[in-house]
Amino acid sequence: MAKFDVYDLSKKKVGELDLADAVFAGEVNEHLFYEVVKAKLASDRSGTHAVKNRSLVSGGGKKPWKQKHTGRARQGSTRASQWVGGGKAMGPKPRDYSYDVPKKVRKAALRSALALRSKDQKLVIVQEWKPEGPKTAAAAKVLAALGAKKALVVDDAANLALARSVRNLAGSDFLAVEGLNVYDILRHDALVLTADTAKKLEASLS
């Protein structure tokens, strides 16, 4: 088990938390990051790109001139791809870029991302963070005290006040623990977890 300090919102140590080495202190596998981030970005692509081929371009139904004895190259339509205003040959079509990554790979990559933030000393665990209402200035002050200005804050989805407070901060964001992913961990400088959230991650990733 790895020991982690637990802080209050002013970064005063209030206790320690034992967490599984396999989840928070394992080996960092950067290739797993590549696999899951690539899949995430692929699934985010809209894939709506399209061009008109010769069957979709309007007009061009009539043969421009007779087949023989004109001295010109034979043509069947003024909407063939070699004509100005013609359809595109073999152009892009709408498609779905998403693909599945095995569940074991996704879990291993998430464990590796947590271990990376832990080794870089960019993982901060707070006892709890339950603001009375959405107060962005107060959230900025807390993150500054924790040394985590551009941070990903993770807690229960029900903590709406915290979510709304953090999401107004440039460079910081809030995620529900169920939606935690490698891409968002890596694109933020620090990771802030509540003690309960850390235990939930330990249980789900062990």
From Swiss-Prot:
Keyword field contains Ribosomal protein: yes
Keywords tagged on the record: Ribonucleoprotein, Ribosomal protein, RNA-binding, rRNA-binding
Region annotation (Disordered) ranges: 48-97
A family per Pfam: Ribosomal_L4
One function term, GO molecular function aspect: structural constituent of ribosome
GO terms under cellular component: ribonucleoprotein complex; ribosome
Protein's GO biological process: translation
Biased composition (Basic residues): 63-72
Signal sequence interval, chain numbering: none
Family to which this protein belongs: Belongs to the universal ribosomal protein uL4 family.
Function: One of the primary rRNA binding proteins, this protein initially binds near the 5'-end of the 23S rRNA. It is important during the early stages of 50S assembly. It makes multiple contacts with different domains of the 23S rRNA in the assembled 50S subunit and ribosome. Forms part of the polypeptide exit tunnel.
Subunit and interaction comment: Part of the 50S ribosomal subunit.
The protein's name: Large ribosomal subunit protein uL4
